[in-house]
Design a protein with these regions (language model features):
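A domain-level signal for the structural core that forms small-molecule/cofactor-binding pockets
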Residues: 1-191
Length: 191
């Protein structure tokens, strides 16, 4: 948007992707960005991809809902649906993980409030990821659980290479390839 008369743009963002060694700790992704053309907007999101049964899913979603409601009562349901639709692998007919929120083109009449929301998304990710890591980091795993993790990570890689807008944007605009592909899991397996 906003490039019809002038194709130049400015973009900045923060992306964090965690692919823990432990198959009990889900892969976690956080991204926020600000883009400026003749228009300006924020985007971003949080999603997690457990490999094994995950007993905190309900708490995760209710906490995200609570955070979103501080800014706009419609954000959670709207952004959760966007996340579920976005992180879907059509060739596998499955979701990449258990979702979260995903938003783009956030530009209300209050830039400061929009920025506060983006900051809250970052704070939520920081606090939630520490909670999960500290809760599960000592839990042991076996070879079968590690194998399940590697298979689940193959879905993560497939999504990023085939469908991710950020990956495509970075590759199409001549970005740093190593930085663009940093979100890939370090190991994955296909059967």
């Amino acid at each position: 948007p906003g490039t019809a008369n002038n194709p130049s743009y400015k973009a900045t963002g923060i992306s964090v992707v965690l692919h823990p060694s432990s198959p009990h700790i889900p892969s976690m992704h956080f991204n926020t960005r600000y883009l400026q053309t003749e228009q300006e907007w924020f985007g971003g999101g949080i999603d997690i991809t457990p490999c094994l049964p995950y007993d905190d899913e309900k708490n995760y979603h209710s906490s995200l809902n609570e955070m979103c409601n501080k800014f706009n009562k419609s954000y959670y349901s709207e952004y959760k649906k966007w996340c579920d639709d976005y992180f879907y692998l059509p060739h596998r007919k499955e979701l990449r993980g258990i979702g979260g929120i995903f938003f783009d083109y956030l530009h209300s009449d209050d830039w400061g409030k929009d920025f506060e929301f983006v900051q809250a998304v970052g704070s939520f990710f920081h606090n939630y990821s520490l909670f999960v890591i500290n809760k599960l980091k000592e839990k042991s795993w076996n070879d079968q659980e590690k194998n399940i993790q590697l298979l689940k990570r193959s879905r993560y890689a497939e999504f990023n290479l085939l469908h991710d807008r950020g990956t495509r944007f970075g590759l199409e605009t001549g970005g740093n390839i190593d930085a663009i592909l940093m979100s890939m899991p370090p190991l994955a397996k296909w059967e």
